[in-house]
């Protein structure tokens, strides 16, 4: 099969974005069934969808009311495409509203529902095949459907929601008031799988090998015979991008590894050894540590740090690219979650991301972001599919701004050194305990807080280091890792004894949400 025929033969389920911070989880769950799923704007037209030729469409949740003046709508012709459609929460209400039903504030029809609720199935449905008649689901709605459109019938309800699941099988239209994409809906994965496989007819044959073929084709068509510049950060994402780009365009790729003085312990030498030596990437190493640290002096605001670093990275690339001939593209390791956290057209910005929000307006390159439709676990799977060794693929995630966002407040060499050394100890002990595959991400943070301590016979007034360790599947949500006490005790003892200017260790037990993974 040729690469072009692979591209044309890929089955897709499109998720239309109506503003939920977690609507991308829908796409992520569907991909788990071996089906490519992508997020598109709710403004997409029926003609544009027809050209994409998806086998299914999902209308996501969102914060608006469908009857409000500023409500996000839908091209009504989409309902006439003959493509199966699943409306989730706002999506179900939108289907109802547009096709002649009625949606009102929940107080006029039952109560608002936020949290787990029991769904009672009243009829059999292909959408709920293999799931129990009563099941826990996550509700999050302030409006409710009171009248369903002609041709629809009730499938399920809850104590506070008269229409929790509806369908029109003749037109292949389905609506559910709850969120199957979150783990709190116990059978949510089964419901989404039923929609993808049983209703949409997905083959379930999407894989990272397909992705590699597609992305290589896209890269070659985009780049042609021109050259690409890639900034290596030392993290998994940029490393995978480097190997993928080299596979696609070979020596048209030049990598710049910028040592901004904000790297982990021995990171520079490790990057050069792994990617420059083993994989033969053409890497230019630039020591710009003084340049970055001078700009960051006395800067405390995390958003300013990110913007400064994002801008300066590109200016460094600009300086280096000016020494090269014919470089037109800048490649980045931006992930789906990076774009999500920076806010989409319909979702509130949580924080700007260094790969999407810190670029200067006068940037001289076109962007290539091969991973911007992938989640972190998919990037690791891609790395394995590309033949990268596990020690690279499972390397701890590291943000582009580096240790700058793991030092609270103003950055100093002393603070940076406390994070470098404590982080190295943490990673070493987690690996020794055999937990490095169980804990999704772990690192240390200099909190900027000093506290009184006693060492030997003397009083100390030194920094407090926080340990952050989380478990997650895709980075969209996360729980703090419940590390064994003996492991935590050993880590704490080593850091206090081996790292200068530190006398207290605390453990971050906050999940995401409400917190983000990084502290800044």
UniProtKB/Swiss-Prot annotation:
The protein's annotated pathway: Purine metabolism; GMP biosynthesis; GMP from XMP (L-Gln route): step 1/1
Keywords: ATP-binding, Glutamine amidotransferase, GMP biosynthesis, Ligase, Nucleotide-binding, Purine biosynthesis
Quaternary structure and partners: Homodimer.
List of residues binding ATP: 233-239
NCBIfam families reported in the protein's UniProt record: guaA_Cterm, guaA_Nterm, PRK00074.1
CDD domains registered for this protein in UniProt: GATase1_GMP_Synthase, GMP_synthase_C
One Gene Ontology MF term: GMP synthase activity
Role played: Catalyzes the synthesis of GMP from XMP.
Residue ranges of every copy of the Glutamine amidotransferase type-1 domain listed in the record: 12-205
EC number: 6.3.5.2
Identification of the protein by name: GMP synthase [glutamine-hydrolyzing]
Listed Pfam families: GATase, GMP_synt_C, NAD_synthase
Catalytic activity: XMP + L-glutamine + ATP + H2O = GMP + L-glutamate + AMP + diphosphate + 2 H(+)
GMPS ATP-PPase domain location: 206-395
Gene: guaA
PANTHER family to which the protein is assigned, alphabetical: GMP SYNTHASE [GLUTAMINE-HYDROLYZING], GMP SYNTHASE-RELATED
InterPro entries named among the record's database cross-references: Class_I_gatase-like (IPR029062), GATASE (IPR017926), GMP_synth_C (IPR001674), GMP_synth_GATase (IPR004739), GMP_synthase (IPR022955), GMPS_ATP_PPase_dom (IPR025777), NAD/GMP_synthase (IPR022310), Rossmann-like_a/b/a_fold (IPR014729)
Active-site annotation: 89, 179, 181
Keyword Transmembrane appears in the UniProt entry: no
Superkingdom of origin: Bacteria
GO cellular component terms attached to this protein's record: cytosol
